[in-house]
Regions:
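Accessory alpha-helical/coil subdomains and C-terminal extensions
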Residues: 1-9, 13-14
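…primarily DNA-binding HTH/wHTH and HhH modules…
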Residues: 69-70, 81-106
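Charged/polar, solvent-exposed surface patches and flexible loops
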Residues: 11-14, 18, 77, 104
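Terminal helix-turn-helix DNA-binding modules in bacterial transcription factors
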Residues: 14, 23-28, 35, 45-86
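Helix-turn-helix DNA-binding module
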Residues: 40
Length: 106
């Protein structure tokens, strides 16, 4: 998935992918990786053209989209499973990312 050889970036992405249901704070990622938040942000901007926070949100939205397409779980349950703080926040983020409401994904 990543063509970067930067081990900090690869490990950060792997940690994010493993912690979608209970996301880590960016500060926690930095502590785990032994880098500053500024260094992590530079890595993400350089190799992925986005901030760590935006990348993490994108991962969570992609997981939600998969769940909407592959399960019969309610939109609310999926929003919760992907760690969005509210259904309205999830709906806004989803619509911004995919140009459609989550309920229209099925």
């Amino acid at each position: 998935r990543l063509d970067s050889r930067n081990t900090h970036l690869i490990e950060a992405v792997q940690l994010m992918e493993r912690n979608i249901e209970e996301p880590l704070l960016i500060a926690e990622l930095c502590i785990h990786l032994g880098v500053s938040d500024r260094e992590l942000e530079r890595l993400f901007k350089r190799y992925l053209q986005q901030t760590p926070k935006a990348f993490y949100r994108q991962l969570r939205l992609e997981k939600a989209r998969w769940m909407l397409q592959q399960t019969k779980d309610s939109v609310t349950a999926i929003a919760t499973a992907c760690s969005f703080i509210s259904l309205s926040h999830f709906t806004r983020c989803y619509q911004k990312q995919f140009s459609k409401l989550p309920s229209k994904e099925r």
